[in-house]
């Protein structure tokens, strides 16, 4: 996939560090995400990817470093304040309201974002995630892939400028993974995507740029082609897959 015309710097992470006791989860992470791109973050299990995403979304506060979003320092802002500025996150584990149907879940997310056009926006989101025909279905009637798609729908309900997708293809079979790939490809038309994903083949198909996180540090950040051929990345990660 070719890289789109360079957009403005949207997310700028500088020297972000986080420890849990004696365990270093983030060791001076530097990361830049530009508007309009799909930027993928890959790395082995335990590399610190989910910890980094939690810091970006505000669920964890870094020990040191700086996070800037759209030119403003958001390092100490709450998740709610970050969401109001246009930064949204989906989760590895679905956080769906099982007492509501599919449309009801999306409506709650739309209303939480302060939209006054709930019905219209719910319809738009369901179309985007491919669940229009399941709008009245209960959550337990959905497949694993459909539940993950709905989780993405909740994240984009507020029309964020940047959406953090934390391993959206985890636990999926081939067909469901390809449907999620198609969904992510659609998202790029109107939002920037930071994709954290273990499926490197999907990453190389989808991403404009790829960053590789190993032992809490970004060791490479470039085009998919450059990352795939990087000797250091092959030795530290890709050669062990």
Which ranges hold each PLM region?
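Glycine-rich phosphate-binding loops of nucleotide-dependent enzymes
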Residues: 2-241
């Amino acid at each position: 996939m070719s890289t789109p015309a360079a957009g403005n710097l949207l997310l700028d992470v500088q020297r972000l560090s986080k420890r849990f006791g004696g365990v270093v989860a983030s060791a001076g992470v530097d990361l830049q995400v530009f508007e309009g791109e799909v930027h993928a973050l890959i790395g082995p299990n335990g590399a610190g990817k989910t910890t980094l995403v939690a810091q970006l979304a505000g669920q964890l506060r870094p020990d040191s470093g700086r996070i800037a979003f759209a030119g403003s320092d958001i390092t100490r802002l709450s998740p709610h304040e970050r969401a109001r500025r246009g930064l949204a996150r989906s989760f590895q584990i679905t956080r769906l309201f099982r007492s509501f149907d599919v449309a009801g879940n999306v409506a709650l997310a739309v209303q939480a974002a302060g939209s006054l056009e709930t019905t219209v926006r719910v319809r738009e989101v369901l179309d985007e995630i491919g669940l229009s025909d399941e709008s009245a279905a209960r959550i337990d009637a959905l497949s694993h892939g459909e539940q993950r798609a709905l989780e993405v729908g909740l994240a984009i309900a507020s029309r964020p400028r940047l959406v953090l997708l934390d391993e959206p293809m985890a636990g999926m079979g081939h067909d469901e993974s390809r449907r999620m790939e198609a969904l992510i490809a659609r998202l790029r038309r109107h939002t920037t995507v930071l994709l954290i994903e273990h499926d490197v083949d999907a990453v190389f198909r989808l991403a404009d740029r790829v960053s590789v996180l190993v032992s809490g540090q970004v060791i490479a950040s470039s085009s998919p082609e450059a990352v795939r051929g990087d000797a250091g990345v092959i030795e530290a990660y890709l050669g062990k897959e």
